């Protein structure tokens, strides 16, 4: 274990980044409410001397850290942007101006111009929404259990599409677009499967986040939208919802391989530069 680690203590997940003995970038992930596991992991790696920490739960985690650690604090978006720029270079993307949409517990959206960034806005709709509605509607409360079900679920029995409204009449927009998320639930009597409900929840979140990102991109005439966040990790269905809607509006979606670890990567790089 190297002497320095970067920690992104988010609302739902805490991510840790470090370089292992082979100098390879390595990650650990914990639920943020399981702080004892995070502390135990740090204590069990005796070589750690310096910790750069960011994220909404960083203060709380710092209070639990005992020992002779050098603690460096870094603002959340400064860490995230540094991590994103590192990954972009690693993946050989040459993009200077883009919208950065970070889908965490909620969603934050920034304009990025070279090294400068401005917060465009955000929404409370995000990964926390997926998990909250999943728990309320299906009693499934682990992200790892939700994702496989969204792959086999269908939104056809719950969402109202433009085509449903117009029937056989020519509509002014694509018939496949969603007119109302969960709209059919109020007008039909059916026992929907957990997989259909979860697929529809994820559709709602994906479309809300994408629509907001597209509005900001259109306002500033920006082509590329980079979507990051742990909510996208191994979540092929959500990525498909976001990418298809983004491309439909003639923008270019980009998903980074380790985008969910951007904050932890940025914190690590800040402490080791």
Swiss-Prot record:
Localization: Cytoplasm
This protein's pathway: Cofactor biosynthesis; coenzyme A biosynthesis; CoA from (R)-pantothenate: step 1/5
GO CC term (a single one): cytosol
Cytoplasm recorded as keyword: yes
Binding positions for ATP per the UniProt entry: 8-15, 105, 127-131, 143, 230
Active site: 76 (proton acceptor)
GO molecular function, one term: pantothenate kinase activity
The EC number(s) this enzyme carries: 2.7.1.33
UniProt KW keywords: ATP-binding, Coenzyme A biosynthesis, Cytoplasm, Kinase, Nucleotide-binding, Transferase
Description of how the protein assembles with itself and partners: Homodimer.
Protein family (similarity comment): Belongs to the type II pantothenate kinase family.
HAMAP family: Pantothen_kinase_2
Function according to Swiss-Prot or TrEMBL: Catalyzes the phosphorylation of pantothenate (Pan), the first step in CoA biosynthesis.
Name of this chain's protein: Type II pantothenate kinase
């Amino acid at each position: 274990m190297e002497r320095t680690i970067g920690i992104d203590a988010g609302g739902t997940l805490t991510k840790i980044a470090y370089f292992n003995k082979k100098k390879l970038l390595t990650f650990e992930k914990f639920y943020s409410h399981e702080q004892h596991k995070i502390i135990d992991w740090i204590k069990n790696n005796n070589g750690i001397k310096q910790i750069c920490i960011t994220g909404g739960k960083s203060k709380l985690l710092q209070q639990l850290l005992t020992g002779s650690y050098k603690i460096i604090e870094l603002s959340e978006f400064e860490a995230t942007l540094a991590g994103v720029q590192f990954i972009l270079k690693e993946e050989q993307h040459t993009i200077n101006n883009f919208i950065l949409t970070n889908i965490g517990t909620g969603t934050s959206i920034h304009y990025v111009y070279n090294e400068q960034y401005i917060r465009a806005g955000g929404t409370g709709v995000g990964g926390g929404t997926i998990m909250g509605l999943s728990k309320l509607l299906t009693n499934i409360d682990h992200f790892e259990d939700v994702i496989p079900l969204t792959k086999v679920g269908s939104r056809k029995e719950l969402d109202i599409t433009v085509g449903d409204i117009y029937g056989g009449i020519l509509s002014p927009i694509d018939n496949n677009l969603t007119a109302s998320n969960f709209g059919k639930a109020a007008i039909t009597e059916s026992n929907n499967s957990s997989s259909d409900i979860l697929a529809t929840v994820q559709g709602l979140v994906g479309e809300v986040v994408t629509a907001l990102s597209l509005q900001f991109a259109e306002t500033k005439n920006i082509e590329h939208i980079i979507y990051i966040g742990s909510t996208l990790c191994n979540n092929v269905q959500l990525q498909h919802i976001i990418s298809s809607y983004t491309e439909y509006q003639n923008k270019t979606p980009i998903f980074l391989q380790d985008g969910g670890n951007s904050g932890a990567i940025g914190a690590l790089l800040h402490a080791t530069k």
